[in-house]
Every structure is written in structure tokens, then in C-alpha cells.
Amino acid sequence: MVRHSFVIAFFACLLLVCLAPARAQQQAQWIPGQDGLNAGILPDQGLTMANLTINYSADSLKNAKGKSIPVVGTFGFWAIENIVYYVPKTKILGGEFAAQVMLPVANASVTVPRFGFNAGGTGYADTWVQPVMLGWSLKRVNTWVAYAFMAPTGRFAPRSSTNVGCGYWGNDIVSGTTVYLTKNKKTTANLATDWEIHSKKQGTNETPGQAFTIEWGLGQLFPLDKKMTKLLQLGVIGYDQWQVTADGGTYSNGIPASLTPFYSVHAIGVQSDLLVPTENLEFFFKFEPEYLAYSHTQGRTIVFGGSWTWGFPKVRKP
């Protein structure tokens, strides 16, 4: 999973510009905007391969009061996530067992023309592993819970402006829920959550504070033919992400990391999906502009991609 590690360079520049101490604040590892509709639905039994592309761009940085800091610049990244789900036929506690791994590649850049400041990096980023997922399919609800961790496999060096990784481990408690609001299950309410706990950052005395993310969506399904072989899904989605505990340790200049203001960011947007159940195919597009941020960049997130499931062959009864 890719993360906002490149914000460090932007904050380091603002340290010089705004004379504000300790602005090299870490952001959450989980990039919001990846979930939305169908948040509680696990893939069918078998192997599911997905490709998800994220583009985030921002030209505004907000202070602890949500006001714009008067510096002209741009911050953005592209990330390509190659995702594999494995869902065996095994049942645990009456629910489906699943596992997931994400293998990401990222490219990011930060530019502040006034000061001739440019930074960025490209390469393999941090790896997301979700070894345990348990999901249940009820009459009007699909839900799952999982444990995941973020491994610091991306390139990282303290105070470098070309980092692709975050330089620390993350442990995550994750969940997803889809509620069917109508009998025909065409109208849904969705919620995904992620609670992050971080280790100390490599080569420093800093421990980023814990973060909590929710992603939500309200969706409607529309058949595109009488046989229901092609389905269009449209909905309103959004995300909210907060830092929930103070940063730990000290920065390289001796300033306590706990003095850094807590960050948060909030967005609302739209999602469209094309589902082809007979071919086990799904394609999706999401657009979420951020409308509020504190101690964080404010911009917009675009996500698009697709998935395909290879189902296990059915065993014929003799």
C-alpha cells in the first residue's frame, strides 16, 4: 500500500517558509478513497486479481485551524496497486476466510516554484498484507473484519526528499459492512473502517500517532439488460481520516513530536461501477474532492481499476 510519505518534503519546505517547528509530520499510511460501494462484500471463493490506480493532487495546505497556508505549490502522486485475494472453501466461525496482499508502485512530486523547491520519488512502495479476514453473509447485511500490517518495503532514508516508503511498520484493524436497504438488494449503505497503530520510524526517534479512517457510500444498482448479465452501479461516497493519538518521541532538532498538531481530512464524491457477473468482472471509477482539512494537504482523489475472479471448479456429485 502506498502512503503520503512525500508530504514530508512539503512540510520540510514549510518549516523554512513559515518558521513553524516540527512540520515534518507523518500522515496516515492508509490512503483514503480506495473503498466506497460494496465495502462489506468479499470476493467469491477462488483467486481474485485486481488492479487499482490512485491519483491524488493538491495545491493547498491547511494549518491546524483549517486555514490555507500562503505558499503556492503542488503535491501529487500516482500509485498502482496490484492486489490478490485468496478465498478458500474453508469456513471459520460460520463465515468465509480470506487473505489479501497489495503490491504497490508509486510516483510522487512536490513543487514550490517561489523557492525553486522540487522533490519526488518513484519505485516500489510499502507492502500491505492482510493475512486474516473473516466475512459473514446475512439476509440483509454483508460484513467482514480483518487484521493487516504494512511492511516498510519502500525506499526510505530520514530527511530524504525521494522516499517512496514510510520507514515504519503499521498494524491495522480493518472492517467493511454493506447493508441492503431494499428487498431486491439493489440499494445499499456501506461503511469501511481502518485503525492504524505505528512503530518507530527507522533511523529516527519519531513514532507517528495512530490514525482512524472511515469510508462510506450509498449506492443504487441498475440492470443494463433483462438477463442481468451487465449491471451499472452509481453512488455517493466519501471519506474521513483523523489522527487520534499524539506523535511520540522527538524530532532531529530535539523538539517533542507530541507538539505537532493532529491532522484530519474529509471528502465527498461519486462512484460508478460496471459489473459483469457472468464473467466475474468488475470495473470502477471514483472521484472525491476534499472539502475540509486540518494540518494536511487539501485536494482531490481519483481511483479507477478493475478485478477478475477465477472461481474454484465445482465438484460434481456422483
Positions of predicted regions on the chain:
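Outer membrane beta-barrel transmembrane domains
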Residues: 29, 62, 68, 203-318
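Short loop/turn motifs that connect adjacent beta-strands in outer-membrane beta-barrel proteins
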Residues: 25-26, 39-46, 88-98, 136-143, ...
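Residues on the lipid-exposed face of transmembrane beta-strands in outer-membrane beta-barrel proteins
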Residues: 39, 51, 82-88, 129-136, ...
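Residues that define the transmembrane beta-barrel architecture of outer-membrane proteins
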Residues: 74-80, 118-128, 165-171, 206-214, ...
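Long, hydrophobic/aromatic-enriched structural stretches that serve as scaffold segments
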Residues: 75-137
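Surface-exposed strand-loop-strand hairpins of Gram-negative outer-membrane beta-barrel proteins
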Residues: 26-27, 56-79, 113-120
